[in-house]
Amino acid sequence: MKILVCTDGSEQSEKTLEKTLVITEGCNVDEVAIIHVDDEKVDFSAMPVGEGHVPTEKEMERFRKMQEEHKSERKKILQDALKVFQENNINARTIFKEGHPSHTIVETAHKEGFDMVIIGSRGLSGFKKVFLGSVSSAVVQEAKDCIVAVVK
């Protein structure tokens, strides 16, 4: 069995990692991959804008630095999750992608032939739907060729 586990660095994601460890103990798991999909956009409000304004080299450099810091923070989420599996002697790999989270998760699961997607019921958005977060709900709806386990 191939398992794709989703993380966004939230407390719910930590629970998802813990439940994935339990599942790997009881199943014949061939592969575990941890995916993080970055849909965050770096805030452009830090750059002065206006009609006729051309950003200076210093402004552009500051913006590039903000982008790199953001990407580094996102990749650290994956490295922290990977460490959880390594500490439990489970081979795992990481997948970092940019895009719409639910679509990217489902597409990755389909293209790479994952048998199961494990995702938390809510993530970092802070917006709470009645039963599921918007990403987990969309993954449940869109994933047609694999099992989706939602961790509460």
Identify the role of each PLM range:
Residues K2-E61, N88:
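Small/aliphatic-rich secondary-structure junction motif
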Residues K15, T104, G126:
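Phosphate- and divalent-cation-binding pockets in alpha/beta enzyme and binding domains
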Residues P55-E73:
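A short acidic, glycine-rich active-site loop
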Residues K76, D80-V117:
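Structural beta-alpha unit
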